[in-house]
Amino acid sequence: MITNDLIAQHSLTLTIASSVLLVFLLSRLLRKDATGKAQGCRPVAKRWQWDPILGLDIVLAQIGALKGNYYLPWLIELHSNMPKTFEINFFGKRQIYTSEPDNLKAMTATNFHDFGIEPMRRHTKGSMPFADKGISTVDGKEWEFSRFLLKPFFYREVYTSTDRIEPFADHMMALIPGDGESFNMQSLIQRWFLDLTTNFIFGKPMDALENPDRARITWAMLDVLKGGRLRAQFYMMMWAFNWTWWYKAVAEVHDFINVHIRETYKEIEEREQRIKDGKPVEPERTDLIWYMAWNLRDEELLRSQLCLVFVPNNDTTSIFISNCIWHLARHPEAWEKLRQEVLAHGDAPLTFEALRNMKYLQCVLNETHRLTPNNVTQIRVCLNDSVLPVGGGKNAKEPFFVRKGDVVSITKTVMYRDPEIWGNDAEEFKPERFDGRRVFWEFLPFGGGPRRCPAQMMVQTEAAYMLARLARVYRRIEARDPAPYTAVMRIGPSNKTGVQIAVYK
């Protein structure tokens, strides 16, 4: 029987335990603050919130921004009237936003081992059942192994080859409508890149250009990316969402990849048996899955690694090229300047070296990265107590202490529009700003430090090649959608209505 005395006794015990826990947490926090002060650190500014306990005001605002397709304006507004470094409460956790290049350098290079992604991506199970271990979910030795599996991305003969791009570009160019006819260039770019990337990753193209229905896998991948972003950002309340649509998309992507995995393992097994029997074998395949399968003989683990390469890679590159064309269609003077540079090359092959030497073309790529970056924010969890160099104190220029468990978000979309870095015309599309400009940590579209994107050179080559091919043929690109850029967030931002244009030879 529960008596009043027993209730009082348990209440007293609970009160004492809660008090001890509170004292412990406060003393731990004070010790950390004392450590920070001893290292010359100063506190960062705090953004006012109507819910300072759980930070649900920011949580709900972010959900609304993502659903309403105004996440980028919301992110810029979040930074407005604040120093370049400030902190918020997000689900009861300290989250630091910063647009200081020196903090990006420290987080991704100088203090690389103090920051990671695994606690917020893998440990939360937010990426499951889509993928578990892979290049974008793990840290430490597991990450080093995932990086090793992507070695073909680093082969110079791969990322410098434009011969592998040419046949797919030829096919896409043949599908572009005649002069003055409106069409969505983004859908063509997506189908072109599906063929190109499936050929590199799986050893054979999907033939999405020839058979548009096969590109339906793109919609499943987009759902996977959208859901993945939501689950990563709101992992503490995944229970509040209905994920049926996401699980369905995950299953569709898995079915597609499983076919290639099983075919590859079967071919490897047959090859090894022929070698064992002393029979001749064909030259080894050079595609990515072949290399990965040789080094990882586990179907589920291989699928996880492949999912975290194939799905994000397909989206980022096709969106980047589409964004280039979206900007150029609205700036005919930039298109003409680019076209004249390409035409000056004559009919000579568009090699890697030739494209790299087209300075204005490279400026266009950079300016597109700047205004519409695929990587809007670069987010890390602090793994060990650390110090970032800029943002503390009243002048927001002193070092500040970052506690283990804190989340740090480098907001590139704000950094890349900072007038102090880019001038008063930072909001304008002006490729000339990169002419002769040496950039460092204030502009790293593919990230910096050990975790920089392994596909950087490949992406730049593919984008440059496609723009150059278009410039050789079309004297004018005309925008057929007067609406401003409305970013739908996937792995990065994509314009809501695609790239509605007309072209003229």
UniProtKB/Swiss-Prot annotation:
It comes from the Eukaryota. It catalyses: (3E,5S)-3-[(2E,4E,8S,10E,12Z)-1-hydroxy-4,8-dimethyltetradeca-2,4,10,12-tetraen-1-ylidene]-5-[(4-hydroxyphenyl)methyl]pyrrolidine-2,4-dione + reduced [NADPH--hemoprotein reductase] + O2 = 3-[(2E,4E,8S,10E,12Z)-4,8-dimethyltetradeca-2,4,10,12-tetraenoyl]-4-hydroxy-5-(4-hydroxyphenyl)-1,2-dihydropyridin-2-one + oxidized [NADPH--hemoprotein reductase] + 2 H2O. Keywords: Heme, Iron, Membrane, Metal-binding, Monooxygenase, Oxidoreductase, Transmembrane, Transmembrane helix. Heme binds at C453. It is a single-pass membrane protein. CDD domains: CYP52 (cd11063). Its EC number is 1.-.-.-. Its main location: membrane. Pathway: Mycotoxin biosynthesis. It is found in: Membrane. The chain crosses the membrane at residues 6-26. Its cofactor is heme. PROSITE patterns: CYTOCHROME_P450. GO terms for cellular component: membrane. One of its GO terms (molecular function) is oxidoreductase activity. Cytochrome P450 monooxygenase; part of the gene cluster that mediates the biosynthesis of ilicicolin H, a 4-hydroxy-2-pyridonealkaloid that has potent and broad antifungal activities by inhibiting the mitochondrial respiration chain. IliC catalyzes the ring expansion of the tetramate intermediate to the acyclic 2-pyridone intermediate that contains the trans bis-diene chain. The biosynthesis of ilicicolin H starts with formation of the tetramic acid by the hybrid PKS-NRPS synthetase iliA with the partnering trans-enoyl reductase iliB since iliA lacks a designated enoylreductase (ER) domain. PANTHER family: CYTOCHROME P450 MONOOXYGENASE APDE-RELATED, P450, PUTATIVE (EUROFUNG)-RELATED. Belongs to the cytochrome P450 family. This is Cytochrome P450 monooxygenase iliC. It comes from Neonectria sp. (strain DH2).
